[in-house]
Design a protein with these regions (language model features):
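A glycine/proline-hinged amphipathic helix-loop "lid/cap" segment
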Residues: 1-78
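Alpha/beta-hydrolase superfamily serine-hydrolase fold, recognizing
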Residues: 68-73, 77-302
Length: 302
């Protein structure tokens, strides 16, 4: 069942301005063709910028370390209230985590009163899902051993949301216990992208470019393979899931199809905000973003 959430009057105005700004920015045109996206991927293969974040201006204690080949940034509240830990997979797949994703992780840690670790996984096109899953499994096994698997939750946005969902099958095949839950914001639920795509209604995402990125991420796997695709992944390996998205984004139809998958529909809660842009939860000025973050914190503390 989908729970639709109407926007406040203030959000209607703010969202209208954000949609206009997005259209004028030309961001969608940048990845509007497969050929242009493949050119960008070729450039990234030659020169991928390193992950070197500015780790100041956060509410929590910030620490960094390397797990396998991934850099991890952990936000730990000065007063930890619950014995849980969240592994956060930032969206991007081909780009390093952004400042807003770091601030988001910091905010969730502060509100949930538990550590949140942002995993800066290896990126396509130089690497693929397999390298990222190996890093995720190493970190997850460590935390599950310390806290118990039921106290470790996976969280991700966009492409990172697809990792949070599909990596559960990898954990199961590696003999690791099921995580305590998954929280996914506007995840890519079908790596092949379904046929019911709201291309015109989304001023940010473009299907041709996104397909090229996802193909690169999947490496030698077909995008329909359950090893990389949440839509065909083993349902029993995926724990209770909270999905948050907009009903106006390109990915919405696939998110809905995933939420009613056999074996998942009774364990999946989907909240869809009316008319917002992809990535709305990062804009702290939106009432909808505040609401989404409250739902995330409630799920973590459950």
């Amino acid at each position: 069942m989908i729970h639709y959430i109407e926007l406040s009057a203030g959000d209607v105005l703010r969202n209208g301005f954000r949609r206009l700004t997005a259209r004028l920015s030309g961001a969608k045109r940048l990845l509007s063709s497969r050929e242009r996206t493949e050119e960008i991927l070729a450039e990234l293969r030659e020169d991928q910028p390193p992950f070197s974040p500015e780790l100041t201006g956060f509410d929590n204690v910030v620490s960094t370390r390397t797990v396998a080949s991934a850099q991890c940034v952990t936000f730990t509240p000065r007063w930890v209230e619950i014995k849980k830990h969240v592994i956060y997979f930032p969206g991007g797949l081909v780009r390093q985590p952004t400042r807003e994703q770091l601030l988001f992780a910091d905010d969730i840690a502060a509100k949930a009163r538990c550590p949140v670790t942002l995993l800066a996984y290896p990126l396509a096109p130089t690497y693929s899902y397999a390298d990222a899953y190996e890093c995720a499994a190493r970190l997850y096994a460590e935390l599950a051993g310390q806290l118990g698997a039921e106290n470790v939750l996976l969280m991700g946005d966009a492409g990172g949301g697809s990792i949070a969902l599909a990596v559960c099958g990898y954990f199961a095949r590696a003999g690791l216990p099921k995580p305590g839950g998954v929280i996914a914001l506007s995840p890519v639920c079908d790596m092949s992208l379904g046929t019911e795509i709201n291309e015109d209604g989304d001023p940010l995402l473009s299907a041709p470019g996104l397909r090229a990125i996802l193909k690169s991420w999947c490496g030698f796997r077909f995008p329909t393979d359950g090893a990389v695709n949440p839509m065909t992944a083993e349902a029993d390996a995926i724990p209770d899931t909270l999905l948050l998205c907009s009903d106006a984004e390109l990915l919405f139809a696939d998110i809905c199809r995933f939420a009613v998958r056999e074996g998942l529909r009774r364990r999946t809660a989907l909240h869809a905000y009316r008319g917002l842009l992809h990535g709305f939860a990062f804009d702290g000025r939106l009432d909808a973003a505040k609401d989404a973050r409250e739902r995330i914190v409630d799920r973590i503390r459950k």
